Every structure is written in structure tokens, then in C-alpha cells.
Design a protein with these regions (language model features):
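Gly/Ser/Thr-rich active-site loops/lids in small-molecule metabolic enzymes
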Residues: 28-40, 90-111
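Short acidic/glycine-rich loop or secondary-structure boundary segments that cap or lie
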Residues: 19-22, 68-70, 82-85, 109-113
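Short beta-strand-to-turn element immediately C-terminal to the catalytic PLP-Schiff-base lysine
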Residues: 5, 13, 25, 76, ...
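Glycine-rich phosphate/pyrophosphate-binding beta-alpha loops
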Residues: 15, 19, 75-89, 156
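A residue-level signal for conserved active-site and pocket-lining positions in enzyme catalytic cores
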Residues: 3, 22, 74, 101, ...
Length: 188
């Protein structure tokens, strides 16, 4: 499976919001001779978390359901891992024709920091349903009056209208006998 985002293809996770802004900042800060690797990531988290705020006001359409609210992030997951090992939806599989979309409402910095570990570890079911929701919508649209930063497998784009859907294109993997691309995936 692949995710189509405004005509661009993504294999694992397409995320919009705070996580995409952090990814973009990592690339920007990575050019600094004073920062590299983990240092640029930690600096990017600090800049975005402390100085830029977490959420943005978006109109999110999940198939036919429209939600207008302030969101910290919206991520469409085809794979399980991104951002240095975060696993928001452990049951996401790259070969099942299902895309899991995670919606995280805008919350205070303190609450976000307190919930991030569970989110990153794929324990979204243990988090408050008024804060996080996971759905299997076929079409997701995110609209805003301001630019939305979206990260597609590490590459960022800017748009005020982000359209995410299961791509008609497919990708074949080759690996050694017995290799399973879904090894470690949660139950279907």
C-alpha cells in the first residue's frame, strides 16, 4: 500500500502538525555545525514545543464526517514507525489496504508531554478519547487558513489543503525467505 498526499506518494506515515513541524526543524537545524543527529532533534522539539505552540485550527474531513477544531496533529498511518521509533498505531500494516488515521486534539504543553510517551509507544487506547481518536477513513482532508506542514516519510510540504487517501499505486518488496514486513505488527 501507499498513501497519496496531494499527488505525492508516501510509504509509512503522513503526518501533519507538531510532529511534521519538528521534522522540518530537524532538517533546518541539522545544517548547524553545533548540532547533529539527536542534538538537532532535541533542539527542534524545544523550538516547536516551547516557542511555537502545539495546535492549529483545522477543518478535518474523515470520509463524510467533518470536524472543525484545534489539533496538535493528524497522522495517516500505513506503516508503524516514524520519528525515531514512535509507533502511534502498532496494528498498521503496509499490505492490508487499510490506512489508520490518528487525530490528536490541541491540549496544553504539560498534558501533551504527559501523554506523548503512551502515544509514541502505540498505547493510544489508554489515552483519553476526548484527546485522541484513531479511525480507518479512506479519505482524509485537512484544511486551514494557514499553511499546514505535512511530513511524508521525512520530506515536508506546505499546503492549506492536504488530501490523503489510499493510493492506487502499489509497491512490491523483496526480502530473504521468511522475512515479513509486518513482523512485530499488532493484531489485524
Amino acid at each position: 500500500d501507499l498513501i497519496d498526499c496531494n499527488g505525492r506518494q508516501c510509504l509509512t506515515i503522513a503526518c501533519s502538525g507538531i510532529d511534521a513541524r519538528v521534522a522540518e526543524s530537524v532538517h533546518e537545524l541539522g545544517d548547524s555545525p553545533l548540532l547533529s543527529g539527536r542534538g538537532s532533534y532535541l533542539a527542534a522539539v524545544a523550538v516547536n514545543f516551547l516557542f511555537r505552540g502545539i495546535g492549529q485550527h483545522w477543518r478535518v474531513t474523515l470520509d463524510d464526517e467533518v470536524i472543525e477544531d484545534d489539533f496538535a496533529l493528524v497522522s495517516m498511518c500505513n506503516g508503524r514507525y516514524y520519528g525515531g521509533g514512535s509507533t502511534p498505531v502498532p496494528e498498521a500494516r503496509m499490505d492490508d489496504g487499510v490506512l489508520h488515521t490518528v487525530l490528536v486534539k490541541n491540549i496544553s504543553r504539560m498534558k501533551f508531554a504527559g501523554l506523548f510517551s503512551a502515544y509514541s509507544a502505540g498505547r493510544y487506547r489508554s489515552l483519553p478519547p476526548e484527546v485522541i481518536r484513531v479511525v480507518t477513513a479512506k479519505n482524509v482532508r485537512i484544511q486551514s487558513e494557514d499553511d499546514i506542514v505535512t511530513c511524508l516519510d521525512g520530506e515536508t510540504i506546505h499546503s492549506r489543503d492536504v488530501r490523503l487517501t489510499l493510493s492506487e499505486k502499489r509497491l512490491n518488496f523483496f526480502g530473504p525467505k521468511g522475512c515479513d514486513p509486518n513482523y512485530g505488527a499488532g493484531p489485524k
